[in-house]
């Protein structure tokens, strides 16, 4: 084992943890005043239940053994056998450290979905949904992409830090949930305004901070690959931020803090699948392209399909990053 790698991964896990409170501020600032408490409480609840589920069954179903390439096994239920020695996924850090890092991914992913149903889903219903979604969607998906013998990994799927496992699954699930629940009352009659702009910016800043642990930590060691992922993360977020602001200037005549915050977040999402694989110039292109795609694409899709995705969560998935990794990815190790 390597003490430096272990300290690095635990620090990155703490960074990723910060993302869920950051998301609570980001979403809480965007919703109407009457929905702020409920929206933020949803993220707080997920912070608690995701840890308990991960220790009891989540880690085992995601990374413990393999059944038909779809789901893990039962050998690590209750963290039984998950100790201080390295596991099968990283040679230089304890299995516990790897499990802790992955636990934070299992926390932020269901929290992302709450943006699609803000102001429409009762808290009790959300509790049941998050528990079932984690069991039926997230754990199997994590195993298929990242687990030993996972079906998607075996056919060549590459996801450096969760663009597919985290962002596409949460984005698609949020879209389906928004369609199922229907529109908010008065959705067609009124215009919804951001409730608290400073909350939105604070949330975006915390997300950017935490995303360094999200992407750099996925190298699972304090090495050059982690440094590369750190920089591509910075570049993509910055490019998307500037790109979104330019779009606002040309289309609306002014820039907004909410727009800049949204731009940087989708830039972070876009680079996630290939943060450790794409060259720096591709990270710039990824950031520059994702803003116009989301800015105009969401308006078109929501207009055509009449979707009430409360916080436009469907726009922030990892599709562009997955494409960038496919066509621009290189072996940097």
Where do the protein language model's features map onto the residues?
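Extended ligand-binding regions for polar small-molecule ligands
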Residues: 307-331
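Hydrophobic alpha-helical transmembrane bundles of multi-pass membrane proteins
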Residues: 1-316
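Residue-level detector of short coil/turn "hinge" positions at structural boundaries
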Residues: 38, 331-332
């Amino acid at each position: 084992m390597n003490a430096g790698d272990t300290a690095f991964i635990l620090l990155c896990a703490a960074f990723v943890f910060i993302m869920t409170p950051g998301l609570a501020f980001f979403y809480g600032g965007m919703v109407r005043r009457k929905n702020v408490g409920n929206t933020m409480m949803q993220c707080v609840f997920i912070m608690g239940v995701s840890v308990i589920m991960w220790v009891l069954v989540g880690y085992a179903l995601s990374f413990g053994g393999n059944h038909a390439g779809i789901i893990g096994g039962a050998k690590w239920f209750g963290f039984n056998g998950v100790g201080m020695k390295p596991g099968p996924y990283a040679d230089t850090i304890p299995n516990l450290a790897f499990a802790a890092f992955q636990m934070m991914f299992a926390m932020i992913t269901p929290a992302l979905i709450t943006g699609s149903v803000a102001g429409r889903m009762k808290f009790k219903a959300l509790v049941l949904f998050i528990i079932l979604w984690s069991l039926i969607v997230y754990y199997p998906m994590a195993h298929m992409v990242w687990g030993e013998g996972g079906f998607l990994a075996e056919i060549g799927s590459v996801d450096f830090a969760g663009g597919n496992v985290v962002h596409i699954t949460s984005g698609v699930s949020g879209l389906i949930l928004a369609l199922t629940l229907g529109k908010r009352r008065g959705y067609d009659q009124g215009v919804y305004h951001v409730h608290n702009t400073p909350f939105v910016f604070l949330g975006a800043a915390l997300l950017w901070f935490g995303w360094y642990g999200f992407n750099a930590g996925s190298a699972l060691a304090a090495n050059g690959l982690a440094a590369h992922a750190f920089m591509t993360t910075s570049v993509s977020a910055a490019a998307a931020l500037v790109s979104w602001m330019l779009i606002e200037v040309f289309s609306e005549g002014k820039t907004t803090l909410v727009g800049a915050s949204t731009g940087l977040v989708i830039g972070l999402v876009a680079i996630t699948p290939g943060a450790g694989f794409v060259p720096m110039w591709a990270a710039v292109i990824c950031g520059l392209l994702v803003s116009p795609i989301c800015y105009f694409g969401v308006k078109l899709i929501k207009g055509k399909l009449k979707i009430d995705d409360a916080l436009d969560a469907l726009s922030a998935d990892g599709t562009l990053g997955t494409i960038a990794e496919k066509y621009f990815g290189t072996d940097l190790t």
